[in-house]
C-alpha cells in the first residue's frame, strides 16, 4: 500500500495536517551489530553530566562510583545531575500539603499489593537478563532459572509463591559467601555420517556446575544488560536500553506500584492513563488555566523537552523521595521499597557483545568480546571508539561498567513523573508569592508547562523560575528544543492540542494492514483497527470504507485467497475454485476461503464467522468449526484475544479483538534451527513449563481460578480436582461406572508414584 489516501478524506482543518510530517509510513529503522558503542556512550555521558560529584569505591565489588547529589549548583545552561536533597524533600512536602494524605493512602494501597502479589508477576515482560547464563532470556525462563539456583543453594522462602518471599531470598543470596549455578555449554565433535559417509559436526549440550564467589555474584545481581533500541522513528542515532535481572525486578515493581498509585491521584500526571482518558485529563488542566486568565492575565504554553532525562536522574534522589513518602509506615515496608534505589546506585551496565573486526584482505572476521576491552591495544580502533574506551576503562570490571549515577531507560517512569509533577505543583500562586503562576502536565520525561502572568515580563520571569527550580532537582529543560506559544497550541506525548486535541492519525498508520498471525486473527485485527480509529481518531466514513477495501485487498494478496470467481492464479487458486464450485451458498465462504467480503463500516464489530454463519452450507460449517480437524493444532481461544499492536509512539499496546475458533486459527510450529544450539537445554526446560501449565489449565479451565493457596502442589491440586469432577460427572450420568473407576485408579497411581519418589 504505497498510497495514503486517508489524508484526503480526514475531516480535518489544515492545522491538523501536522500528522503528515511524522516519520511513520514505511518500515522503521532497526539496529544491526552490537550495542556496545551506544552503551559506552550512555555510561560516558552520564558520568560527564555528574563529573563534579564525589568519587567513592564500593567495598563489596570494588567498583568506582560517582555521587553527584548535593553537588555544586550549575553556573551555566549545560545539563547536569546535581540534584539537591533538601530541595527534593521540600518539593515532596509541598506536594503533600496540596494533596493531603496522598502518600499515606498510596502506601496503604501498595502494602496490600505487596502482600498479595505472586512471584509469577515477574514472568510478564519480554527479554530479561538471566544472571545464571549471563545473557538474555524470556522472562519466565529467567525467573525459573533464578528460583532453581536459589533452591539448590538452600534459599527456599520463595516456595510460598509470594513475590515478597522471593525477595527475601534475593536479600539472603547477597549475604552468601558463594553461589553455585548450572551453566549450559556445547561440545562439538567430528563424526562420520553412516548414510552419506560424509564428516559432520555433532553437537552435544552439557550442563556444568560453577561456583560464583560473593563479589562475582553481586556484580551479576546488580547487572543491567544492554541492547539497542529498535524501530525508533525520527532519529538518526540509535540508543541503548537496559534490561535488569530478576534480583532487581521485583523491587522495582513495588516502587512503581507506589508511584503509580500516587500518579493516579495527581491531576498533572500523564501516567498511568492513556488514550482518551489522558486527553480528558490534559484538557482539564488547559481549561483551568484558560478560564483563570480571561481578562487580566495572558497565558503561554511551553511544549517542553528535557535533555537526557534518565542520565541526570539519580537513584539516590529516588531513595530520598521514598524515605519521605513512607515516613510513617512500618519498617519492613520502608525497607522493601528502599532496596530498588539502593541497587540502582550500585548498578553495573553490561557492555553487550563487544566489537566485530574484519580484515578485508585476509577475509577474516573476529569478535572482540566486551570483557577484553579493559586491556586490548587501542591501535585497532578508530579515533571516536578509542576515546570512548579510554574514558570508560577506569569503570570496567569483568566486561561490565560501573554506573552509579543516572537511571536506565524506562525503569522508574512513574516515580520520575512524581518528581516532575512536584515542580508543576510549586507553580500555584500561594507558592510563587508573586503575580505569575504555572501549571502543566508531566508524563515520564515529557512535559507541557502553562504559565499565566499579567504581562510578558511576568511570563518570562515565571519560565526562568521554573527552569531554575528544575535544575535543583536534577531536571534539565532544554532551551534549544522547547518552544513557547500562546496557550491553545502545544504538543504533549505526541498529542497535538489546538483548541482541543487534534487527531494525529499518522501515529496509527503502522497498525493498518495484515498482522501476520493467522488468517482468523488477521481478519479480526484488521477490521478492529479500522473500527477503533473511527471511534478515537477522526477516521471519517468515506475514508474508513476505503481503508476497509484496501485492507481486504491486502489480506487477499497476503494469504493468496482471491475470490473463487477471479482470474488471478496463485498456489491456492486451484483448491479455492474447487471449493467455490462445490458451495451452494457462496456468500457463506470466509474471505480466506475465497468468499466475498461482507464487511462494511456498520458491521465491523461482528466477527466474520458470525456475520456469515447463517449463510454457510451445513457441511462447510462442520468443517470450519470442527475441533477434531486433524490438520489444525488448536489453541484454546478465549472469547477475546489480545494482539500486541506496535503504535508509532510509546510502548506496544494490547489490543483486544473478538476471536472465534475455526480451522483458520492455526499456530505455526517453532523453527527447528534452534534445536542444534546451546539454547536447546533451555528450550526443553521451557517446553516442560509450557506443558505443565497447559495441563494445569485443562484442570482449572476458568481463567479466573484462584491459585491453590497453601502447600498443595500443582499435582495434588489436579488430582483432587479430577476426583471431584469425575464424581459429579458420574452422579449426573455423564460418564459410565467403568470410566469413573478408571479415573479413580489413575489418580491413586499418580499419588502412589509421588510417594515413592
UniProtKB/Swiss-Prot annotation:
Broad class of where this protein is predominantly found = host cell
Which cellular component appears as one GO term in the record?
A: host cell nucleus
Q: Where is this region: Disordered?
A: 53-82
Instruction: Pinpoint the RdRp catalytic domain residues.
Output: 286-483
Motif placement: Nuclear localization signal: 187-195, 203-216
Region Promoter-binding site, residue ranges: 249-256
Q: How is it modified after translation?
A: Phosphorylated by host PRKCA.
Catalysed reaction, written as an equation: RNA(n) + a ribonucleoside 5'-triphosphate = RNA(n+1) + diphosphate
Q: What does the UniProt keyword field contain?
A: Eukaryotic host gene expression shutoff by virus, Eukaryotic host transcription shutoff by virus, Host cytoplasm, Host gene expression shutoff by virus, Host nucleus, Host-virus interaction, Inhibition of host RNA polymerase II by virus, Nucleotide-binding, Nucleotidyltransferase, Phosphoprotein, RNA-directed RNA polymerase, Transferase, Viral RNA replication, Viral transcription
Please indicate which superkingdom the organism of origin belongs to: Viruses
Pfam families, A to Z: Flu_PB1 (PF00602)
Subcellular localization(s) per the UniProt record: Host nucleus; Host cytoplasm
Q: What is its EC number?
A: 2.7.7.48
> InterPro entries annotated for this entry?
RNA-dir_pol_NSvirus, RNA_pol_PB1_influenza
- Disulfide bond sites: none
Compositionally biased intervals (Polar residues): 55-64
One annotated GO molecular function is: RNA binding
The GO biological-process annotations, alphabetized, read as: DNA-templated transcription; symbiont-mediated suppression of host gene expression; symbiont-mediated suppression of host mRNA transcription via inhibition of RNA polymerase II activity; viral RNA genome replication; viral transcription
Whom does it interact with, and what assembly results? Influenza RNA polymerase is composed of three subunits: PB1, PB2 and PA. Interacts (via N-terminus) with PA (via C-terminus). Interacts (via C-terminus) with PB2 (via N-terminus); this interaction is essential for transcription initiation. Interacts (via C-terminus) with human PKP2 (via N-terminus); the interaction competitively inhibits the interaction between the RNA polymerase subunits PB1 and PB2.
Per its database record, what is this protein's job?
RNA-dependent RNA polymerase which is responsible for replication and transcription of virus RNA segments. The transcription of viral mRNAs occurs by a unique mechanism called cap-snatching. 5' methylated caps of cellular mRNAs are cleaved after 10-13 nucleotides by PA. In turn, these short capped RNAs are used as primers by PB1 for transcription of viral mRNAs. During virus replication, PB1 initiates RNA synthesis and copy vRNA into complementary RNA (cRNA) which in turn serves as a template for the production of more vRNAs.
Family per similarity comment: Belongs to the influenza viruses polymerase PB1 family.
UniProt name for this protein: RNA-directed RNA polymerase catalytic subunit
Task: Tell me which species this is from.
Answer: Influenza A virus (strain A/USA:Iowa/1943 H1N1)
Amino acid at each position: 500500500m504505497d498510497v495514503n489516501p486517508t489524508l484526503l478524506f480526514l475531516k480535518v482543518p489544515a492545522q491538523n495536517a501536522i500528522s503528515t510530517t511524522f516519520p511513520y509510513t514505511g518500515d522503521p529503522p532497526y539496529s544491526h551489530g552490537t550495542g556496545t558503542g551506544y552503551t559506552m556512550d550512555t555510561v560516558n555521558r552520564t558520568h560527564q553530566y555528574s563529573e563534579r560529584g564525589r568519587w567513592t569505591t564500593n567495598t563489596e565489588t570494588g567498583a568506582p562510583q560517582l555521587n553527584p547529589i548535593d553537588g555544586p549548583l550549575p553556573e551555566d545552561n549545560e545539563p547536569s545531575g546535581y540534584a539537591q536533597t533538601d530541595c527534593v524533600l521540600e518539593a515532596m512536602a509541598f506536594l503533600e500539603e496540596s494533596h493531603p494524605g496522598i502518600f499515606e493512602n498510596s502506601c496503604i494501597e501498595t502494602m496490600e499489593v505487596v502482600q498479595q502479589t505472586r512471584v509469577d508477576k515477574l514472568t510478564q515482560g519480554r527479554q530479561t537478563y538471566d544472571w545464571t547464563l549471563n545473557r538474555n532470556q524470556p522472562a519466565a525462563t529467567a525467573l525459573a532459572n533464578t528460583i532453581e539456583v536459589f533452591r539448590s543453594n538452600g534459599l527456599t522462602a520463595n516456595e510460598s509463591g509470594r513475590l515478597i518471599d522471593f525477595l527475601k531470598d534475593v536479600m539472603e543470596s547477597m549475604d552468601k559467601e558463594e553461589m553455585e549455578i548450572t551453566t549450559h555449554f556445547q561440545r562439538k565433535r567430528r563424526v562420520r555420517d553412516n548414510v552419506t559417509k560424509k564428516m559432520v559436526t555433532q553437537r552435544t549440550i552439557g550442563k556444568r556446575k560453577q561456583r560464583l564467589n560473593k563479589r562475582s555474584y553481586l556484580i551479576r545481581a546488580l547487572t543491567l544488560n544492554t541492547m539497542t533500541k529498535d524501530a525508533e522513528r525520527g532519529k538518526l542515532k540509535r540508543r541503548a536500553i537496559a534490561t535488569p535481572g530478576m534480583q532487581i525486578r521485583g523491587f522495582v515493581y513495588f516502587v512503581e506500584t507506589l508511584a503509580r498509585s500516587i500518579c493516579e491521584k495527581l491531576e498533572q500526571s500523564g501516567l498511568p492513563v492513556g488514550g482518551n482518558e489522558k486527553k480528558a485529563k490534559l484538557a482539564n488542566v488547559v481549561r483551568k488555566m484558560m478560564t483563570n486568565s480571561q481578562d487580566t492575565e495572558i497565558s503561554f504554553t511551553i511544549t517542553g523537552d528535557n535533555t537526557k532525562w534518565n542520565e541526570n536522574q539519580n537513584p539516590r534522589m529516588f531513595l530520598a523521595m521514598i524515605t519521605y513518602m513512607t515516613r510513617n509506615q512500618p519498617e519492613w515496608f520502608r525497607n522493601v521499597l528502599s532496596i530498588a534505589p539502593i541497587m540502582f546506585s550500585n548498578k553495573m551496565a553490561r557492555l553487550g557483545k563487544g566489537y566485530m573486526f574484519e580484515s578485508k584482505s585476509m577475509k577474516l572476521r573476529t569478535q572482540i568480546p566486551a570483557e577484553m576491552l579493559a586491556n586490548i591495544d587501542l591501535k585497532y580502533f578508530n579515533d571516536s571508539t578509542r576515546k570512548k574506551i579510554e574514558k570508560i576503562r577506569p569503570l570496567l570490571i569483568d566486561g561490565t561498567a560501573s554506573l552509579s549515577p543516572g537511571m536506565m531507560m524506562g525503569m522508574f517512569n512513574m516515580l520520575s513523573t512524581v518528581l516532575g509533577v512536584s515542580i508543576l505543583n510549586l507553580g500555584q500562586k500561594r507558592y510563587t508569592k508573586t503575580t505569575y503562576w504555572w501549571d502543566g502536565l508531566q508524563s515520564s520525561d515529557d512535559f507541557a508547562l502553562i504559565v499565566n502572568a499579567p504581562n510578558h515580563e511576568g511570563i518570562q520571569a515565571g519560565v526562568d523560575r521554573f527552569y531554575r527550580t528544575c535544575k535543583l532537582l536534577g531536571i534539565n529543560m532544554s532551551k534549544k528544543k522547547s518552544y513557547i506559544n500562546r496557550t491553545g497550541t502545544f504538543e504533549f506525548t505526541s498529542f497535538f492540542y489546538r483548541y482541543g486535541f487534534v487527531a494525529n492519525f499518522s501515529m496509527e498508520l503502522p497498525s493498518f494492514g495484515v498482522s501476520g498471525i493467522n488468517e482468523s486473527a488477521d481478519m479480526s485485527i484488521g477490521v478492529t483497527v479500522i473500527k477503533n480509529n473511527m471511534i478515537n481518531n477522526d477516521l471519517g466514513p468515506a475514508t474508513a470504507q476505503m481503508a476497509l477495501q484496501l485492507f481486504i485487498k491486502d489480506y487477499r494478496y497476503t494469504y493468496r485467497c482471491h475470490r473463487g470467481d477471479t482470474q488471478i492464479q496463485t498456489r491456492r487458486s486451484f483448491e479455492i475454485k474447487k471449493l467455490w464450485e462445490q458451495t451452494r451458498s457462496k456468500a457463506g465462504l470466509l474471505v480466506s476461503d475465497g468468499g466475498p467480503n461482507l464487511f462494511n463500516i456498520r458491521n465491523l464489530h461482528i466477527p466474520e464467522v458470525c456475520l456469515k454463519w447463517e449463510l454457510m452450507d451445513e457441511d462447510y460449517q462442520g468443517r470450519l468449526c470442527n475441533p477434531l480437524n486433524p490438520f489444525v493444532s488448536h489453541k484454546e481461544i478465549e472469547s477475546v484475544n489480545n494482539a500486541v499492536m506496535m503504535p508509532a509512539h510509546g510502548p506496544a499496546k494490547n489490543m483486544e479483538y473478538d476471536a472465534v475458533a475455526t480451522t483458520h486459527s492455526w499456530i505455526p510450529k517453532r523453527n527447528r534451527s534452534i534445536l542444534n544450539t546451546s539454547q536447546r537445554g533451555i528450550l526443553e526446560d521451557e517446553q516442560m513449563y509450557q506443558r505443565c501449565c497447559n495441563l494445569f489449565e485443562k484442570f482449572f479451565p476458568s481463567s479466573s481460578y484462584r491459585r491453590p493457596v497453601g502447600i498443595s502442589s500443582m499435582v495434588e491440586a489436579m488430582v483432587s480436582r479430577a476426583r471431584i469432577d469425575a464424581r459429579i460427572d458420574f452422579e449426573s450420568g455423564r460418564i459410565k461406572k467403568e470410566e469413573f473407576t478408571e479415573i479413580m485408579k489413575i489418580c491413586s497411581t499418580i499419588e502412589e508414584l509421588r510417594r515413592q519418589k
